[in-house]
Amino acid sequence: LRNPDDGSTFNETDVNQDGSLNDPDTIGGRGYASSENTAQGGNATTITLSNTETANSTKYVGMRVVITAGTGAGQYAQITSYNPGTKVANVAKESDGTAGWDNWHHSNAVQNTLDATTTYSIEPRVYFTGGGGTGAQVRAKVSSGRITQFFIINPGSGYTQTPAMTIVDPNETIEAPFQIRIGNGVLA
């Protein structure tokens, strides 16, 4: 995991959550999908992906779309449905499940109109449950179908125990092993 505030990292290791050694062929998992491209447009509850996207209707459902640059930069959401004919993905806020976008930069207003300057990244959606704390947010970097890094966007607060981390990607064939660490109530 990587913390953007101090640059500390935790990359994949050869150790499973239970401390046992990993099969080197499973490091990073298998079958994870990702896509980076320029949007055609979008609104408060949708994004129209690039006309070069070749995904079927189920490939991206449940995954996260992040606006990485241009109009809407910093916004992110869970993809709830995708029409490969129109390239329209419907999105929901990860914070409460309602239609729309969240923003990594809470002080920035959500842009309700996306345009041809909007670039996006579709990636596995990572979320945390339990542990007594809240607010931890992590992005997963995918290369060649494997998760190669986790980036801590927000380390959260109030964690008294290690939370459970879930990686959502309907394309995954072998789950990526990972280990979560907390220190001083936050992801470390």
Question: What do the predicted segments below correspond to?
Answer:
Residues L1-T45, T58-G70, T80, Q111-A188:
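Conserved, function-critical positions that sit in or immediately flank catalytic
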Residues A73:
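Exposed loop/turn and edge beta-strand positions of beta-sandwich/beta-sheet ligand-binding modules
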